[in-house]
Amino acid sequence: MIQEQTMLNVADNSGARRVMCIKVLGGSHRRYAGVGDIIKITIKEAIPRGKVKKGDVLKAVVVRTKKGVRRPDGSVIRFDGNACVILNNNSEQPIGTRIFGPVTRELRNEKFMKIISLAPEVL
C-alpha cells in the first residue's frame, strides 16, 4: 500500500537510491498503489554519475511492498520493504538495465515483461 509521501527503495541500476511517491496514477481520487501499479515519484537520494539526479520527477512501477500481495489460493507474498523500478516518462519502459531482488508474478503483463526478464527471481 503505497500512498503520497511514501519513501521507497529503488530496485534497479538507474542511479537513484531512495524516491518518494508524489502521486498514485490511475483515477482522480485513488489513494493507494500496490504491486504492479504505476506511481509518480521524485528522486530524493541518488548516486553520482547515475542516469537520474536528485529532484527529477519520473514514473515508477511498484515491485515490492511490505503490505504484500494476496494470491487467489489465499497465500500472501510480503517483503521487508517497499521498492519500485523507475520508468521512462513516455515509453513506460525501465530506465535501468538491471533489476535487484525478487519481483512478483503479478507484474507479468505485456507492459512489464521487460522487468520480469531482467529480474533475478520471480515469486
UniProtKB/Swiss-Prot annotation:
GO terms for biological process: translation. Keywords: Ribonucleoprotein, Ribosomal protein, RNA-binding, rRNA-binding. The keyword Chaperone does not apply. GO terms for molecular function: large ribosomal subunit rRNA binding; structural constituent of ribosome. InterPro entries: Ribosomal_uL14, Ribosomal_uL14_bac-type, Ribosomal_uL14_CS, Ribosomal_uL14_sf. Gene3D superfamilies: Ribosomal protein L14. GO terms for cellular component: cytosolic large ribosomal subunit. Coiled coil: none annotated. It holds the Pfam family Ribosomal_L14. Part of the 50S ribosomal subunit. Forms a cluster with proteins L3 and L19. In the 70S ribosome, L14 and L19 interact and together make contacts with the 16S rRNA in bridges B5 and B8. Belongs to the universal ribosomal protein uL14 family. HAMAP family: Ribosomal_uL14. Binds to 23S rRNA. Forms part of two intersubunit bridges in the 70S ribosome. This is Large ribosomal subunit protein uL14. It comes from Salmonella arizonae (strain ATCC BAA-731 / CDC346-86 / RSK2980). The gene is rplN.
